[in-house]
Amino acid sequence: MYRGTASSTAATEVGTVRDVTITTDPQKAPTTTRGTAGTPPVETEGVVSIKWSCDWTMVNDTSDASLTAFRTAAAAGSPIALRLKDYSAGKGFDGDVTLSCKEGQPLAGEQTFDFTATPTKKSGRAPLVYS
């Protein structure tokens, strides 16, 4: 995972994330047409948009610059650049995102932050789901 300033490709590696989940969910609409000569139609559908999100967890560490950047962006509703790769030279998401944040404060154990990123075009850059 890489982070950066919105409207540019993220270049700062974030090595302190864990439990990353990427969700790609094609949104569909019906495309069924009438059958002919007494033949019932077969229901069909087509993709009209793609819903994408990324969830990850970070352990609270006040010296972690990436955690601070993510928390600041989430609190302000400001977009940031996010780049994900399936391996070091691989492909993945590249675009600007907005973040939501949940803070876990367990009675026992470590304090964590759970982030969810969703794409935005607010900074003028179209998201690429797998590039």
Describe the function of each predicted region:
Residues 26, 58-62, 86-88, 101-105, ...:
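Beta-strand elements of well-folded, non-transmembrane domains
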